[in-house]
Amino acid sequence: PQMFGLRGQAVHRAASGWSPVYVQQVAADPQTGGEGEDVELGVMSVGFMTPSDDDALIWRGPRKNGLIKQFLADVDWGELDFLLVDTPPGTSDEHISLVQLLGKTLGPDDGAVIVSTPQEVAMLDVRKELSFCVKTKLRVLGVVENMAGLTVPVTGLGFRDGTGNDATEQAISMIRERCPELLSLSACLDIFPPANGGAQAMAESFGVPFIGRVPIEPALARACEAGLRALPGSSDVMAPIVERILRQ
């Protein structure tokens, strides 16, 4: 709910089933890059059902599985173009239930998108998820590497001196005076250096497509905090990834 700007909303039960909470968004025109048609996105989350955002759900497997079944069978989704299910990390009851409940309805274009960060400690778990997909015969549409580096304009960097005090203003002034062309560049940092080839090598070892990398994007994080798809004027770092997934 937070990422869609839907905190405080509630689901309602009608004769046809639960009604999802809808958010109106404007899709980008793939030809011009400008605004296209309005799209209606239905959202269903257990977050709509708790008395408080801070409440924990202390449920065992059978109860969680029952709720997943209700979300799939008892929600009046209407006619869908896509059904996206965001699952927790790992291979748990939720994943098994989803595969069992959706298994017979999955077509040749359906499957899982696996997301990993480039560190080995993360990929250890993600390899288990890929193995799960192989054993359950769930198609893997591809692997995405998240948090793949950070790009910051030089003018957006902070600087400190040897004692830890802020020296940003002095550093920028020195650059402007001695090498002003640097101010038009960006600094690229590998916050989490890829281990053993990162997610791309992992995808290749399992014989599944590597979709691409998503950098650490502060503007995207701020957009999620504000419940927006993207902040006005910021680049849409997810657009290339979405396009590649749709082509799978």
PLM feature spans:
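Amphipathic alpha-helical transducer elements in NTP-driven molecular machines
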Residues: 61-69, 92-95, 120-127, 193-200, ...
